Amino acid sequence: MEFAATADRIIVDGAPDFSRFNIVEIVRDSLQIAHISVIEISMDIAHIIPGALTSKTMGQLAELKDEFGHSYTVHLPFWSVELASFNEPVRKGSVESIVESIRLAEPLEPECYVLHSTGSLAAEISRLNYSKEMVNVICTAMAGFSARSVEEILTQTEIGPRQIAVENIEFPFEITRSIIDEYDLSICFDTGHLLAKFSGNESIFDFYKTHKDKIVELHLNDGTYKNVEGVSVTDDHLAIGTGDLPVHDFMIELVKDCFQGPTIFELTTEEVKQSLQKIRTVVPEAL
């Protein structure tokens, strides 16, 4: 669920009313949308909205599977989390947050856990106006801290490494891929992030073909990138068909490969419906 939509639910007359937020009912409503059979639970909710995600809530969400026959994926916390931090207390606290979330979400039996292996600090460093070589050196050093965090997460939770799907975010993905290979992790491919050139300059097809051996989940959304007088202007998490995504050709590629992994729309409800209608019109065999 998008943050703005969540805020609209709980803010009344300028003040938050957390009693208005019920994740079980939100999931139930989402499953009424045609073609939606996988729900991704954002574990940041547990920290943003007190009492919204508890062991009891997780049990109720798990029971919904008997009613609707759907499955879950889990997006592990990323706000205020930095697994690549060189500040050890911050790094260890980030690991603890991830581990707690995995344990809390276990009753859902998620298909995978989506992980940001680097956070906002690493993203900021990746944007530094230094030489590409210097930025790569610093990012590689931060990836070393991230790798240590991943190892600790796997050790403490004892989950299979391929259950961890590392998302392409604002950080050089060729560096992230080295962590994925080292620990035999999986990949969550966010199309909008790539279209906005957050994780690299490859085309959608080049990224997919290079990494499809590891891709187990899609965050399917549109995005744009423009260079305006030397300034990068980007947008992501757009409804399908409103950005630069080659909808027909990319979806056909997925159909040819018989991709069966979870496909998640990180969009508002109306944008999800708009996106599904676009896919239904352009490439109905993908639904």
Give residue spans per PLM region:
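N-terminal pre-domain/capping segments
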Residues: 1-81, 88-100, 186, 286-287
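Histidine-acidic metal/acid-base catalytic patches
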Residues: 2-3, 29-30, 83, 111, ...
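A cross-domain feature marking catalytic cores of carbohydrate-active enzymes
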Residues: 5-9, 14, 41-45, 74-78, ...
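Acidic-and-aromatic substrate-binding clefts and catalytic sites of carbohydrate-active enzymes
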Residues: 10-23, 44-57, 82-84, 121, ...
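Active-site acidic/histidine proton-transfer and metal-coordination neighborhood
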Residues: 25, 84-186
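A structural motif
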Residues: 35-36, 105, 110, 161, ...
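Conserved, mostly hydrophobic/aromatic
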Residues: 39, 75, 94, 105, ...
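Alpha-helix-loop-beta-strand connector modules within alpha/beta enzyme cores
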Residues: 58-79, 145-157, 245-253
